[in-house]
């Protein structure tokens, strides 16, 4: 019965991970650079299912190591290599999720296939550094008992503790702290969005008069509109007669440059205190401010009702605002794409948190008992069947 269950798990592992690799390599929607982590992780799991589990099953069923001693040393090194690689891959994925959520604007521009491949190479090098010492340093080996040969993991305390810390406990601690940080960021973002949904202004934000779009009537002209650009024609020393319509040439006077300073669209204003206050809040502000996230003046920062579209120039006139440049549709489409991307990042982070939590719970008993045998081998020895 055990052999049948393990055989089914081997086939299921190979088939499922092969589908993951095939989907990422063939589906255009899954060709994002971060999905290379899943390809490498699936490859490590396939190697475990093909090169490790069958020999472990044979060793358990026969009760001794049927294969040669050389293959035993290689088999143990590959076992540590592939299992450590799987765990460190999950740690790297959790860090990638954290950077994608906390530093969305900055990290997404740096998340290139080359960068992801370098991280994957680092993961495999860490796993190799943990698995190779038993092959290089044999240490004081106990003589083999007479009878059938056995193939066991390295029993020296220094290697047990160092490999357990590097393979499991350090990555596990990093994953727990990272997902706790992601949870706090999501909770803070949700609590910030609630008062703004009710119409309450942000702390420290003064109430600004509402500027109506072009073509609507304005009952009371705000004082902010009385500028050299507000009364067209006065820059040349005369005004338009009553009843004469304004032309586009009159609205834009070359002799009167706009008095509002330009604010870049690349998010620099947020770093200088216009919108966000920390890298973790950049993604939140990108979603909160909406498609009109870049204000025409510092007084209009982070106020959705007063924002012009991104990439547009705003001129104040007697009738309200005149928008020059790119239209609202393009800016709104870009904002919705960014918001959808951030939503996918958060949803994928939740799924990965569940998967990693189950993975950690499955690995913890082994590494705990394995380390406990090195700390107190006489009094804390775990029964062989339970191990």
From Swiss-Prot:
User: InterPro entries under this entry?
Assistant: ADR_fam, ADRA2B_rcpt, GPCR_Rhodpsn, GPCR_Rhodpsn_7TM
Where is the sequence biased in composition, kind Acidic residues? 279-290
Chain positions of site Implicated in catechol agonist binding: 163, 167
The main place the protein resides is membrane
Which pairs are disulfide-linked?
Answer: 72-151
Annotated membrane topology:
Multi-pass membrane protein
Q: Which GO terms describe its biological process?
A: platelet activation; regulation of smooth muscle contraction; regulation of vasoconstriction
Q: Where is this region: Disordered?
A: 193-303
Q: Which residues lie toward the Extracellular compartment? A: 63-72, 141-156, 376-384
| UniProt-annotated site: Implicated in ligand binding, residues | 79
> Its function?
Alpha-2 adrenergic receptors mediate the catecholamine-induced inhibition of adenylate cyclase through the action of G proteins.
- What is the protein's quaternary organization? Interacts with RAB26. Interacts with PPP1R9B. Interacts with GGA1, GGA2 and GGA3.
Q: Which PANTHER family match?
A: ADRENERGIC RECEPTOR-RELATED G-PROTEIN COUPLED RECEPTOR, ALPHA-2B ADRENERGIC RECEPTOR
Family assignment?
Belongs to the G-protein coupled receptor 1 family. Adrenergic receptor subfamily. ADRA2B sub-subfamily.
Name of this chain's protein: Alpha-2B adrenergic receptor
Taxonomic lineage: Eukaryota, Metazoa, Chordata, Craniata, Vertebrata
Its gene? Answer: ADRA2B
């Amino acid at each position: 019965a055990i052999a049948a269950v393990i055989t089914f798990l081997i086939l299921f592992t190979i088939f499922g991970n092969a589908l993951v690799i095939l989907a990422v390599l063939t589906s255009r929607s899954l060709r994002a650079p971060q999905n290379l982590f899943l390809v490498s992780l699936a490859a490590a799991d396939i190697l475990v299912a093909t090169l490790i589990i069958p020999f472990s099953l044979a060793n358990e069923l026969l009760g001794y190591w049927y294969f040669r001693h050389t293959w035993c040393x290689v088999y143990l090194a590959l076992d540590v290599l592939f299992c450590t690689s799987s765990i460190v891959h999950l740690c790297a994925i959790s860090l990638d999720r954290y950077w994608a959520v906390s530093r969305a604007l900055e990290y997404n521009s740096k998340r290139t296939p080359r960068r992801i491949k370098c991280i994957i190479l680092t993961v495999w090098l860490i796993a190799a550094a943990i698995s190779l010492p038993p092959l290089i340093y044999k240490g004081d080996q106990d003589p083999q008992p007479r009878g059938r040969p056995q193939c066991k993991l390295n029993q020296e305390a220094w290697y047990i503790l160092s490999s357990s810390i590097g393979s499991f406990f350090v990555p596990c601690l990093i994953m727990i702290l990272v997902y706790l940080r992601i949870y706090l960021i999501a909770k803070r973002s949700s609590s910030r969005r609630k008062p703004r949904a009710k119409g309450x202004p942000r702390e420290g934000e003064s109430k600004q008069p509402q500027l109506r779009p072009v073509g609507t009537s304005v009952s009371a002209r705000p004082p902010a509109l009385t500028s050299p650009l507000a009364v067209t024609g006065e820059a040349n020393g005369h005004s338009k007669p009553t009843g004469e319509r304004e032309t586009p040439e009159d609205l834009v006077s070359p002799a009167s440059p706009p008095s509002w300073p330009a604010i870049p669209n690349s998010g620099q204003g947020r770093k200088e205190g216009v919108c966000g206050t920390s890298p973790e809040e950049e993604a939140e502000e990108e979603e909160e401010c909406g498609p009109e996230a870049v204000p025409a003046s510092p007084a209009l920062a982070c106020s959705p009702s007063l924002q012009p579209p991104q990439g547009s120039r705003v001129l104040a006139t007697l009738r309200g605002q005149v928008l020059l440049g790119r239209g609202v549709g393009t800016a709104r489409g870009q904002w919705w794409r960014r918001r959808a991307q951030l939503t996918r990042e958060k949803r994928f982070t939740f799924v990965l948190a569940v998967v990693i939590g189950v993975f950690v719970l499955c690995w913890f008993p082994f590494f705990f008992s394995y380390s406990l045998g090195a700390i107190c081998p006489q009094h804390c020895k775990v029964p062989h069947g339970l191990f």
